[in-house]
């Protein structure tokens, strides 16, 4: 299907991968599909896409897996973006148990000599980090940071097809 989407103008690909450890991925998602997803990522990188990005929700377990993510970008020219977990109306207990402030990940990256990559205006809310020994980059999307809304230029869709103009807003528009 990816070839078909490319023929119709696909230029970017974002894929959610909350863990690179198969067992942890299955625990988070409820499906054992990590090998197929990673095969699809490698296939997509061979196509003339402008950019491939992986998104992972930043959780308490992320620091234990940081080496797996960094190893993954060591040989692949792609971005892995960690998105700070947001508290919503229906995830208070999960949030309390799993929330990890983005600054903790940023501190770990900086201690390993990852440096902030200047972002062009309009590039979105991710704070990007690079390292001279790695082909890929690591991004951190921190909605609770002081300057998140200033750099946000995104519209978001829920899994139910509702358009959300703001992560912090309660309203949405059904597009179905």
Range-by-range predicted roles:
Residues 1-79, 83:
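Radical SAM/AdoMet-radical enzyme domain recognition
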Residues 68-75, 85-176:
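Auxiliary Fe-S-binding modules of radical SAM enzymes
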